[in-house]
């Protein structure tokens, strides 16, 4: 997806420009399948049979590193890990990197490949997975009244973010603009959201403050029973607070 994003953007960083183009690919877990396989080999054949590449393949930031190597991008390079928010945070943090002047462009995205026995067992034990095995096509239904959990999937997505003047100077056609980004924590529980959703609302308000205007709602595709009501409450609190600030 990084190759597709660069091709669509028409961006081929070479020479000194490659020093100003970075990579930020987020992942929630990293190379879990490599870790799973290494554990299996060690149990069955002993530690000397574990490939030394395990140490590299399991690291979450290797996706960013491999993209940088493939395209010769020598700018800022790291990853973010923030569970279900990882991809969104990657875009936001990359935008902040550009705004503070540490890059003129960033290849940004998210990737995940957690369909392994260990991951499925772990999520199953938390009670988070859908058990609608008899109807897999409709198992993932985050906004349905009868939702019963989420479905683990694999995938990747990539974007190219650029400083606006840089994009226009080289004749690129911007598809969208990141005008505000906010981040906040509930500091409440390892998996359950804070009941009033103030952390989520606070992140929305921070994004709005940076943008100087109202932002578009982006509902997270969560299928847990408490997900939809809390998400609606977050957005409602977010707009009420914005109205209060505007009236002050």
Question: What does each model-found stretch correspond to?
Answer:
Residues 56-60, 64, 87, 91, ...:
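Generic structural signal for well-ordered, non-membrane alpha-helical segments
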Residues 134-219, 232-235:
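Condensing-enzyme catalytic core mediating Claisen C-C bond formation in acyl metabolism
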Residues 20-24, 104-108, 140-142, 175, ...:
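Short glycine-aspartate micro-motif
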Residues 2-12, 60-63, 68-71, 76-112, ...:
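Active-site-proximal alpha-helical scaffold in enzymes
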Residues 102-148, 181-195, 224-230, 248:
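Acyl-CoA/ACP chain-elongation machinery
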Residues 20, 24-29, 81, 85, ...:
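Short glycine/serine/threonine-biased micro-segments
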Residues 1-82, 111-120, 214-245:
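Conserved beta-ketoacyl condensing-enzyme motif
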């Amino acid at each position: 997806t990084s190759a597709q994003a660069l091709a669509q953007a028409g961006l081929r960083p070479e020479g000194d420009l490659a020093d100003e183009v970075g990579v930020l690919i987020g992942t929630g877990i990293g190379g879990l399948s490599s870790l799973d396989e290494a554990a299996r080999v060690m149990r069955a054949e002993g530690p000397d049979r574990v490939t030394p590449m395990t140490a590299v393949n399991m690291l979450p930031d290797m996706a960013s590193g491999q993209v940088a190597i493939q395209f010769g991008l020598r700018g800022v390079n790291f990853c973010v890990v923030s569970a279900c928010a990882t991809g969104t945070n990657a875009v936001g943090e990359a935008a902040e990197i550009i705004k503070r002047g540490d890059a003129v462009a960033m290849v940004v995205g998210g990737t995940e490949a957690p369909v392994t026995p260990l991951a499925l067992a772990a999520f199953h034990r938390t009670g988070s997975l859908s058990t609608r095995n008899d109807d897999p096509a409709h198992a993932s239904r985050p906004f349905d009244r009868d939702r019963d959990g989420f479905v683990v999937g694999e995938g990747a997505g990539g974007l190219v973010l650029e400083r606006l003047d840089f994009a226009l100077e080289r004749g690129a056609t911007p598809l969208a603009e990141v005008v505000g980004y906010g981040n906040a924590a509930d500091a409440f529980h390892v998996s359950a959201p804070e009941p009033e959703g103030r952390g989520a609302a606070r992140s929305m308000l921070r994004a709005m403050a940076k943008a100087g205007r109202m932002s578009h709602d982006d509902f997270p595709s969560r299928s847990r029973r408490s997900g939809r009501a809390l998400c609606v409450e977050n957005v409602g609190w977010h707009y009420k607070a914005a109205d209060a600030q505007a009236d002050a």
